[in-house]
Amino acid sequence: QMVLAADYAVEHNIGLVPDLDLRSARRAFISSYPDELQEMLRLQEVKLEKKKSTETIIASIDNLNDHYAGGKIPPYNAVKNNVLRVYAYKNGPAGIEPKTLSDITQQCRIEIISEDSVRIIIPPAGKNQPHACAMVSFTLFYPDIFGPHLIEFQKQILQQYSDARLSGVCKDEWGFPPYFPRFYTENTYDFWYSKHSAEEYARKTGGRELLSDCLLMARPMKKKETERQVAVNNFMEMVLQRNILIENSFYDAVKEIFGKDAAVTV
């Protein structure tokens, strides 16, 4: 059909520039690479009870959609979740006191409610640890921006239409799923995350752990403001450079497959 449409356009002196964004082919991507899905890491801080357990429920964001999700194309919603870590600490006027910070994940009870929500039962507050932060990863129906096969898959889509006389290719507003101000919830902090982005972060920062640095970025820590700023800059720069690489690869692939005069548009 694409070949016929392109031929018709050429015959009528019209340039056909279809949208061939891989987000429209998410089912095919996920079928081929089920371990390369984007995750949203949600951090939720709670005040702990002194003498009894504290229960908290963390849920994913509903209707995480845009114009690439609708009709017969599934939304970007969560397909599973995983409690990655629970920290306990004291959060004072100057921020989290690092000496009080400890990993209490193994002491918590976890109950999966559904693909998009989880209940965590946290034990009573320990000495100098009146606060806790649960870190839950929600795997989305969306390709991992840092997935090792994403760029290759993007090019394969274009190659499927190499026999069509297209004037170019477009894709609109590439990047992570949409995140709007209405999604913000007090004491909840969200980061785009995946095992592949964590590996890249460690590589770029000389071995730092993205998961623990997400807590540092989310909540100030006493006497660690400079370290926090560096973590934010490292994370943002890593995301920027990865998306530049993806966009440049798309541009180069369009020119290679459809010719140097092919349009690359949004």
Per-region residue spans from a language model:
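Gly/Pro-rich turn-and-neighbor structural signature
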Residues: 171, 175-266
